[in-house]
Structures are given as structure tokens and as C-alpha cells.
Amino acid sequence: MEALVYTFLLVSTLGIIFFAIFFREPPKVPNKKMK
């Protein structure tokens, strides 16, 4: 069960960092192909 907890913590941390960067820097350029 420890692996599941660590995976959840890792995903949540990455999600928080991603949202923080995404919302701090609003996309000015209209996304043509964001991949």
C-alpha cells in the first residue's frame, strides 16, 4: 500500500506545480499545437 501512497503524493505534487506555473503565467500565445 505504500507504493500507492507515494504514487499519489508524486502525482499530486506534480499537479500542484503544473497548475501553479500554468496559472502564474497565463498563455498569451493562442495554442496552435501544444504537445
Curated annotation (Swiss-Prot):
Q: Which residues cross the membrane?
A: 3-23
Q: How does it assemble?
A: PSII is composed of 1 copy each of membrane proteins PsbA, PsbB, PsbC, PsbD, PsbE, PsbF, PsbH, PsbI, PsbJ, PsbK, PsbL, PsbM, PsbT, PsbY, PsbZ, Psb30/Ycf12, at least 3 peripheral proteins of the oxygen-evolving complex and a large number of cofactors. It forms dimeric complexes.
Q: What is this protein called?
A: Photosystem II reaction center protein T
The root-end lineage is: Eukaryota, Viridiplantae, Streptophyta, Embryophyta, Tracheophyta
Membrane topology (UniProt): Single-pass membrane protein
Q: Does the keyword Membrane apply?
A: yes
Q: Which family does it belong to?
A: Belongs to the PsbT family.
Recorded hits in HAMAP family, A to Z, give: PSII_PsbT
**Species the sequence originates in:** Nymphaea alba
Function according to Swiss-Prot or TrEMBL: Found at the monomer-monomer interface of the photosystem II (PS II) dimer, plays a role in assembly and dimerization of PSII. PSII is a light-driven water plastoquinone oxidoreductase, using light energy to abstract electrons from H(2)O, generating a proton gradient subsequently used for ATP formation.
**Top-level taxon of the source organism:** Eukaryota
Q: Which UniProt keywords apply?
A: Chloroplast, Membrane, Photosynthesis, Photosystem II, Plastid, Thylakoid, Transmembrane, Transmembrane helix
Annotated InterPro entries = PSII_PsbT, PSII_PsbT_sf
Q: What's a GO biological-process term for it?
A: photosynthesis
Q: Which Pfam families match?
A: PsbT (PF01405)
